[in-house]
């Protein structure tokens, strides 16, 4: 067996791989650690779901492994040093969900700008709803310049939004700010000026609890927050206090970690906190992009070519699941 799939690719990408390699698609084994350990022993490459941790012990059960791939972004579940030591290539579809996450953030901003959306969604037509606002003429703060922020900036500018931003890893003189037409500010300045904040900062363990009481003290009252970053960026107590005292009028976050707002948490049952189960990146289009990226990189790793070109057929996914796909050929070098 060349490739073990513990997470499915789209059918077209799977068929393309099967024409070139021995592929075993067994997503049902992902919940059985014993089955996974047994299956990876003979695999040269594996596609893993988010929930499977790659540790040194995991790699001990995969002596032939040359590549491991994931359809999602993030390396906190992978021991990268151990992979480097064993010459295992780590493949991630890092840009596949950029546009889908940017669209989620834009949609979340538009929803929260219409105050009372929570009452309206549950059918309360007589709720005491404050007047909403429009994005046009407002100031949006981009917290983090991850690739999603680049696409979001291009979406917001035609709507008449003034963009300000902050990223602890990007100097205020970096050309990217000018290129995106985003005014770089210090964190206190951004929070003081922005009417709403979009959080898409790349997460690292050193940023755990980065958005704390000291940071949120700079929020002007009534700010709206949306985000697709890891919820570990937030200090739960500080966020709860800001949601309760009005510094943050409403907050919508995608993909919060387990326990973030569960019973016993200060965020539990706050009516102005909206959590969605990682739906920002969960689109047909992003799944298609991720599947083809992973398929191409796996083939590249297992069948390296010296100057040859491989004809690859990609099948764009339309919005109608029953429609006959169009076939578009392109070259991978």
Where are these regions (language model features)?
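An N-terminal-biased, well-structured beta-alpha scaffold segment characteristic
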Residues: 1-91, 192, 212-214, 218
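Rossmann-like dinucleotide-binding domain for NAD(H)/NADP(H)
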Residues: 104, 222, 228-333
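Short, Asp-centered acidic motifs that coordinate Mg2+ and/or phosphate
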Residues: 44-45, 67, 196, 224, ...
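Phosphate-coordination loops involved in phosphoryl transfer and adenosine-cofactor binding
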Residues: 65, 136-139, 222
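Phosphate-binding beta-alpha-beta segment of Rossmann-like dinucleotide-binding domains, i.e.
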Residues: 86-143, 151-159, 309-310
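Conserved acidic E/D residue at the C-terminus of a beta-strand in Rossmann-like folds
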Residues: 167
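Rossmann-like adenosine-cofactor binding region
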Residues: 54-56, 170-266, 282
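Hydrophobic/small residue at the entry helix of a nucleotide-binding pocket
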Residues: 148
